[in-house]
């Protein structure tokens, strides 16, 4: 687990990164807790096909190749909740007062809920997005978890993910 990313990492990823998060330069910690999981593994092939055919285009091309390499062994199911006892904030998991939603699940859902999904029919005027601009450090969330959520809901994928590097100001 990386506390900077607020994300679980697989044993393979931890080994490949020599136990250090490449984005935060801090060691991963071993963590065990009860969570709900989103079965994104079931969508690996459909996501791969959407990216390979540019139905969900990833630009620049080297970021597309980077994510397709990440997809080679399929996606791992992802924890979608955290124990409430460990957090002083969070959206409660419906029907389970002991759990709150993992921040990336509710953050990604904002793309469609802010335009009225599922209650206001006008949301369909704005979705699918023509372009989503994201940072390089959140590509796996936007090209893996987010498409799996959309496919699970039977919704179309964004048309393009434009992945930029980090923008700094004054050396920061």
Summary of predicted features, one role per range:
Residues 4, 22-172:
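Structured secondary-structure scaffolds
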């Amino acid at each position: 687990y990386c506390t900077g990313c607020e994300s679980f990492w697989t044993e393979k990823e931890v080994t490949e990164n020599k136990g250090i998060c490449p984005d935060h330069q801090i060691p991963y910690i071993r963590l065990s807790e009860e969570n709900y999981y989103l079965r994104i593994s079931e969508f690996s092939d459909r996501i791969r096909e959407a990216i390979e055919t540019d139905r969900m285009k990833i630009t620049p091309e080297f970021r597309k190749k980077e994510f397709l390499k990440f997809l080679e062994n399929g996606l791992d199911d992802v924890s979608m909740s955290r124990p409430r006892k460990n957090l002083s904030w969070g959206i409660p998991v419906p029907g389970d007062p002991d759990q709150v939603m993992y921040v990336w699940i509710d953050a990604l859902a904002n793309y469609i809920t802010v335009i009225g999904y599922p209650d206001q029919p006008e949301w369909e005027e704005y979705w699918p997005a023509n372009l989503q601009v994201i940072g390089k450090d959140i590509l796996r969330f936007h090209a893996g978890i987010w498409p799996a959520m959309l496919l699970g809901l039977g919704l179309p994928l964004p048309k393009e993910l434009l992945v930029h590097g980090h923008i700094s100001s004054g050396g920061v």
